[in-house]
From Swiss-Prot:
It is found in: Cytoplasm. It comes from the Bacteria. Belongs to the MnmG family. Keywords: Cytoplasm, FAD, Flavoprotein, NAD, tRNA processing. NAD(+) binds at residues 280-294. This is tRNA uridine 5-carboxymethylaminomethyl modification enzyme MnmG 1. The keyword Metal-binding does not apply. HAMAP family: MnmG_GidA. One of its GO terms (cellular component) is cytosol. Homodimer. Heterotetramer of two MnmE and two MnmG subunits. FAD binds at G11, A12, G13, H14, A15, G16. Signal peptide: none annotated. GO terms for biological process: tRNA methylation; tRNA wobble uridine modification.
Length: 628
């Protein structure tokens, strides 16, 4: 058996799958090693994809050549368009996955992809050698391969670690704890020790998941039914479906009695007893944490979501907890519709090792070990979408590393992927990181619906998307700009414009003749309305949507573009790699420590390091002007 590979990906969750596919699609012989082949792309918690910021990540992965977007479009129970009454920066799609079909079909995709070998084993050791750095006479460590629990050595030029919650994973339910990376699945106990021995800093986080209920024991007559869209906005531009699934979800609420039971049983909560003493995701708190933090809140939303059309398991979104089994049962009896519900799987917390991402370059390669990339929860993130985005970038850059090409770096003005990676490297967070629109300074530019436009140059740089699709996207982009220019040059008389508005029951009126673009700026006027009125060209929906948005929000987009120009200037003020921050007088100790840890490549990057102030930046620039 040939055990030599270009790239080895460790872990086959959402990060590992995207990394392996990206590497293989770029022509590299790739091994994907996982503890369990049957749980590839497993949705360990909520069986859904998308949400604020997260949907943006998925569309970005998709246009660059990743898999998640088209996969959730195909294997979902429902898709829901959210925030449709809000501005374009807030509009998104959320998909409820058929988790078993999603998982099975992703494995099939991997098995049918050329250059990928699937291997079930546990990686226990990272193998390296010392080589002389070409830029100086120092020695650096370089990847040579991995060693598994079975004693097998696999050789590789590059390794991507995408280990999820399995590094020294420990499950907690009440006062019970045991080693596992996921309930019923063993943990990887030795790999993080190997990383420590290589000088990589390791810390601990935790996350948790709610109980799963037996659908047959739920009284749905007491619940509010919520259906998806028959014709949603899909995650992928290349998805063509006549009609989407509309399997419902259901809404209920906790009651006064629920809060009373939780307060009464709070002493059994692992976060109170000390059984869990690491940080969990702030934006997905357990129900006991919610009651602790918001003791006066009378009720909390609970969404009941099917996990698959071929399963009776119901995911209880909003009831995450690791309280003892008997307490979980007590809580259910206080919730409308769930009084007689039977638990199929109890909620639990899982603690695990991760490696703070300040140790990485923006390519996601480790700074100490050449050829070692990290992606997903091992970098301190939560969420399938965050994992997939990192996995894709790590897989692409692993391939670029082997070819001796420059890594693909996406900055925070170009994509939510850039925001995610930039924040991970520069901003310390006390809990697993989640992408949010509030973290993105340029939200209007980084819309869910325009990834194909803002990332077009990166699509070509990555090199996965085929020529026909690139030509299709290029034509679509040209159509957008051509039609915007056309609308700005079409003159419409005052009388004709006002008759048109009257026909749409719009009260607004013009006092003089206008350009067609001014008519489209009116809130309730769509491109389709204008198309009929002025006999305009017809385009695909995603093109028409861009024409509308770019005209209606033109002033705001221009303002944001000016801010991006200022950002880019700082990004191109490069800091020498060998700069000695100890020589710069006046910098705070906190800033000096952060700068030494991250070693920013530009002034722009330095501004985003935790603890670095504007005064510190001024001193660095002054030092560079004098000394360098």
């Amino acid at each position: 058996m040939n055990k030599d590979y270009d790239v080895i990906v460790v872990g086959a969750g959402h990060a590992g799958v995207e990394a392996a596919l990206a590497s293989a699609r770029l022509g590299n012989k790739t091994a994907l090693i996982t503890l369990y082949l049957d749980t590839i792309s497993m949705m360990s918690c909520n069986p859904s994809i998308g949400g604020p910021g997260k949907s943006n990540l998925v569309t970005e992965i998709d246009v660059l050549g990743g898999e998640m977007g088209r996969h959730i479009d195909e294997f979902n129970l429902q898709l829901k368009d959210l925030n449709t009454s809000k501005g374009p920066a807030a509009r998104i799609t959320r998909g409820q996955a058929d988790k078993y079909k999603y998982r099975r079909k992703m494995r099939e995709k991997l098995e049918k992809t050329e250059n990928i070998s699937l291997i079930q084993d546990c990686v226990e050791e990272i193998l390296v050698e010392d080589i002389k750095d070409t830029q100086n006479s120092n020695y650096i460590k370089k990847i040579t391969g991995i060693k598994t629990r079975l004693g097998i050595i696999y050789n590789a030029k590059v390794i991507v670690l995408a280990t999820g919650t399995f590094l020294k994973g420990k499950i907690v339910i009440g006062d019970v704890s045991y080693s596992a990376g996921r309930q019923g699945e063993t943990s990887a106990e030795k790999l993080s020790d190997s990383l420590r021995e290589l000088g990589i800093k390791i810390e601990r986080y935790q996350t948790a998941t709610p109980p799963r209920l037996d659908k047959k024991t739920i009284d749905f007559s007491q619940l509010e039914e919520l259906k998806g869209e028959e014709h949603p906005r899909y995650f992928s531009l290349f998805t063509k479906k006549e009609k989407n699934n509309t399997v419902p979800t259901w809404l209920t609420y906790t009651s006064d009695k629920t809060i009373e039971v939780i307060k009464e049983m709070m002493k059994f909560s692992p976060i109170v007893s000390g059984m869990v003493n690491t940080h969990g995701p702030r934006h997905c708190p357990s129900i006991d944490r919610k009651v602790l933090n918001f003791p006066d809140k009378e009720k909390h939303q609970i969404f009941l979501e099917m996990e698959s059309e071929n399963s009776d398991e119901i995911y209880v979104n909003g009831l995450t907890t690791a309280m003892p089994a008997f307490v979980q049962e007590k809580i259910l009896k206080t919730i409308k519709g769930l009084e007689n519900a039977k638990i199929m799987r109890y909620g639990y917390a899982v603690e695990y090792d991760y490696a703070p991402a300040s140790q990485l370059y923006p390519s996601l390669e480790n700074k100490k070990i050449s050829g070692l990339f990290f992606a997903g929860q091992i970098n301190g993130t939560s969420g399938y979408e965050e994992a997939a985005a990192q996995g894709f970038i790590a897989g692409v850059n692993a391939a670029k590393k082997i070819k001796g090409e420059k890594p693909v770096i996406i900055d925070r003005s170009e994509a939510y992927i850039g925001v995610l990676i930039d924040d991970l490297i520069h901003k310390k967070t006390p809990e697993p990181y989640r992408v949010l629109p509030s973290r993105a300074e340029y939200r209007l530019t980084l819309r869910y619906d325009n990834a194909f436009m803002r990332l077009f140059d990166k699509i070509k740089e990555v090199g996965i998307v085929d020529k026909d699709k690139i030509e299709f996207l290029e034509k679509s982009i040209n159509d957008v700009y051509m039609e915007i220019n056309n609308l700005k040059n079409i003159s419409v008389s005052m009388n004709e414009a006002n008759k048109f508005l009257e026909s749409l029951d719009i009260e607004e009126r013009f006092v003089k003749g206008v350009k067609a673009s001014e008519i489209l700026k009116i809130k309730d006027v769509s491109y389709d309305n204008l198309k009929v009125f002025l006999n305009l060209n017809d385009y695909e929906d995603f093109v028409k949507n861009q024409i509308e948005t770019m005209i209606k929000y033109e002033i705001f987009i221009e303002r944001e573009n000016k801010q991006i120009e200022k950002f880019k200037k700082l990004e191109h003020m490069y800091i020498p790699e060998n700069i000695n921050y100890d020589e710069i007088k006046g910098i705070s100790n906190i800033a000096r420590a952060g700068l030494d840890e991250v070693r920013p490549l530009s002034i722009g990057e330095a501004t985003r390091i935790s603890g670095v102030t504007s005064n510190d930046i001024t001193l660095i620039i002054a030092y560079m002007n004098i000394k360098l």
